[in-house]
């Protein structure tokens, strides 16, 4: 564990576990979480002989709570800084939710940085918000409401999201895991309110269409069909049609936070793709 300082002076926290000569998997977390959200994957792939790396996005987790730069361009630049510092070119990049958008932007923005493969899990691309050119997207008012809830009572908001739609705990018959809810809350409250507030705009209004089209490496897209946060029909399904060399796996009944609730299945499919 340590920090990388970016060209604009932001300290980015990272984890780097495993043998230096092992194949590398670089994990990108979702909003408003941290690298801790990848525990189930990092421990699994460490045992499988990989070197695993994850960072806390600027303003998230243990990274600097800077007030600006909360957009996909800066997110991608921060990833590039970590990659260069650790010398982990040629990694497989795995992103969940907003992290999936970050992966797409990084791969497209840095074509000269070797990347082995990319994985988008419950990811926000190609575009979440409804526009004239994206009539199937979610109304902007949905994201305005997220910002309003964060502004009014961030602590309560960060309990309601994981206790409800994020893990599908609001579905009939679902068994709520309070420790999972509290871990989500803990990660969210570690980060900065300004970063999270601006991050809602970044993940909802960024159009990743051209970035997806530029990706040359193999891409695995994993998405739950019961994702209440990033609906499958407007995201994973469309992204699979935009990438040149993509594979889509959808999971009936799986929620947005499936890397946690369905870790065994997700890890198995990730491992098969990475080793293929």
UniProtKB/Swiss-Prot annotation:
Temperature-activity profile: Optimum temperature is 30 degrees Celsius. Stable below 75 degrees Celsius, and retains 69% of the original activity at 80 degrees Celsius.
Biotech and industrial use: Can convert substrates at high concentrations to desirable products in a short time. Thus, DCH exhibits significant hydrolysis activity, with stereo and/or regioselectivity, toward the methyl esters of bacetylthioisobutyrate and cetraxate, and is expected to be applicable to the practical synthesis of these compounds.
EC primary class: hydrolase
Keyword tags: Hydrolase
Function: Multifunctional enzyme, which shows esterase and perhydrolase activities, and is capable of organic acid-assisted bromination of organic compounds. Catalyzes the hydrolysis of 3,4-dihydrocoumarin. Aromatic lactones other than 3,4-dihydrocoumarin, such as 2-coumaranone and homogentisic acid lactone, are also substrates, but their activities relative to that of 3,4-dihydrocoumarin are quite low. Also catalyzes the hydrolysis of several linear esters, with specificity toward methyl esters.
Gene behind this protein: dch
Name of the protein in question: Bifunctional esterase/perhydrolase DCH
Domain AB hydrolase-1: 23-254
EC number(s) stated in the UniProt entry for this protein: 3.1.1.35
InterPro entries with a match to the protein in the record: AB_hydrolase, AB_hydrolase_1, AB_hydrolase_fold, Epox_hydrolase-like
